[in-house]
């Protein structure tokens, strides 16, 4: 695995609940919820149909650019991704156009709410409210207890429809989900750049607009992310955009690999995986910090976990950051010295040559030390998703899931599921798995749960 100047900033764990996609507004996929292995399947929900994807998978090869085995980049609706809060599980359905609520303990459906088009993204739950967007161009806010409508807001100014994926959808569908922070819900609407796309901030309490801006050159698709100051907007097969959360001003488009997987580490964004399976890390200011092989990443305060199509690995962050920073500075200095050599002579030239020799030796030492930053590396045949639950990494595969010890990568447990396990979530000692068959599996440890009562 090739790592190139990878700065991994610390990101806090989510709390006990999993109230939004990948647990929080940074989409870290990390939870404090401990799982007591071996887990037992407690229930399966499969009554909402099979996910109806907005886009087919990629062609196998890009012969023009000589790229084979293309990696999917638009993966946001391959399963019914779930949110969990206060003992209830919520998901949107692209099959039946509803927002569903299940009892997280039993899998019993408690209520559902019809929209007018597919709901492709997991809802966000905050303060007893469930907020979700639909392909009908509307953001819905429902009461978590009973599904009662509190407010709804159409983001675009008009209600125009057209056929899309065999359904009638808005000319401005909500294809980024909703991210909530400090009482404000951020959302986008739009898919066709020529028709304009809207980026908006709404008050969670009322749905009133805080700000709304229109852009004619972007196609927002993929889960929104938020840091302290910035809103990050994935842009389909293009690279993400950065917005100021205060007023919605678009600050820049990031360079690097495209794709709709992304996480925030402090104010850096890691995104990809690009069509070659490469990810990019960029700062909120736009500086590209890293490029590396990977499908998914989890960042914690001490260790970062990299998930590729074939491997799972752990990396010592602080040492790695220090070494890669030094390496970057040395390479920059070597470039300056090399450029200046033709213009030097005598003692100045000898001094520059000695510095180049010393820096080359130090770079060799740094490369060895960087390799030693890798705490462990394990073969992983489950490439579809990964989360961190307490001290275990859970990986999704085809028709099964697997758990690995975060401390050393040892395999702890496996279990079969119905379909490809694209969506994972953990809360209150339970693991929830969403697959491309439309199934949602719940795993728990009944003996541990009984002891805790």
What are these regions (language model features)?
Residues 12-453:
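Noncatalytic, solvent-exposed loop/strand surfaces
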Residues 2-11:
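Sec-dependent N-terminal signal peptides
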